Regions:
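Ordered, amphipathic secondary-structure segments that act as subunit-interaction surfaces
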Residues: 94-118
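Detector for outer-membrane/organellar transmembrane beta-barrel domains
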Residues: 110, 114-157
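Repeated loop/turn-to-beta-strand initiation elements of outer-membrane beta-barrel proteins
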Residues: 43-51, 79-84, 113-117, 147-151, ...
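Bacterial Sec-dependent N-terminal signal peptides
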Residues: 1-33, 217
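Start-of-domain marker
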Residues: 28-85, 90-92
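Transmembrane beta-strands of outer-membrane beta-barrel pores
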Residues: 53-59, 77-79, 86-92, 111, ...
């Protein structure tokens, strides 16, 4: 059984490496680095506080494209977790720096140690355009083979104004550091964004190398 899992991990690592190689050589103009730092801790048995910071660096423009802070509280009921959060985003568009404020509700359900689903309902308060609701649905699957080294796969779709506007697919590794509250999660992410005009619908693609640093108390 262990040999079978080891074979699967080798294939996943090979795919991850090939994706990264393809991005690095072929798609520099659509390549970004995302860094995430989040910290969470329980204040009671079923109540958790969380803070997150993320930035996105664009190699196309050689600058930080956007950053955000996100904080809130979640409550766990058996396999269901409900959370209320607030996000503040700053993004560069051409020569301007614009802001967006985004309260959101999260509903997560953990079926087992491998499969988890999350639904997010967010209200986008934009500086330069109309405010709008957006819905996000993410499925996560992990191979829990060892205690501190587990590959994972995620797919998240974004729906706004009854249309699919974005899709994110990611493949990575969850690394736990023994005897500490720290985790490191490097991953490759492919993001597809809908581009619509009066008569046509097109999609643009962004390749991302994402590294997340997590602390859980």
């Amino acid at each position: 059984m262990k040999e079978k899992y080891f074979f699967v991990i080798r294939k996943l690592l090979l795919i991850f490496f090939l994706f990264f190689l393809f991005v690095d050589v072929k798609s520099q103009t659509n390549f970004e680095n995302w860094s995430v730092f989040d910290i969470a801790g329980k204040v009671k048995n079923n109540i958790e506080l969380k803070f997150e910071y993320k930035n996105k660096y664009s190699h196309e423009n050689s600058q930080l494209r956007s950053s955000h802070v996100d904080f809130g509280v979640s409550y766990k009921i058996n396999k269901l977790t409900i959370g209320g959060f607030y996000r503040e985003i700053y993004e560069r568009k051409k020569e301007s720096r614009v802001s967006e404020f985004r309260p959101h509700l999260d509903f997560s359900y953990k079926f087992n140690d491998n499969l988890k689903l999350r639904f997010r309902n967010e209200y986008r308060i934009k500086e330069l355009s109309d405010n709008a609701f957006r819905f996000r649905f993410r499925s996560s699957y992990s191979l829990n083979i060892w205690d501190n080294f587990n590959p994972f796969f995620q797919n998240e779709i974004f729906i706004s104004k009854k249309q699919l506007v974005r899709d994110r697919v990611s493949l990575g590794i969850n690394i736990k550091i023994n005897n500490t509250p720290f985790k490191i999660k490097p991953s490759y992410l492919l993001e597809a964004n809908r581009k619509s005009s009066e008569n046509t619908v097109d999609w643009s693609y962004r390749h991302v190398l994402l590294i997340a640093f997590n602390i859980r108390f």
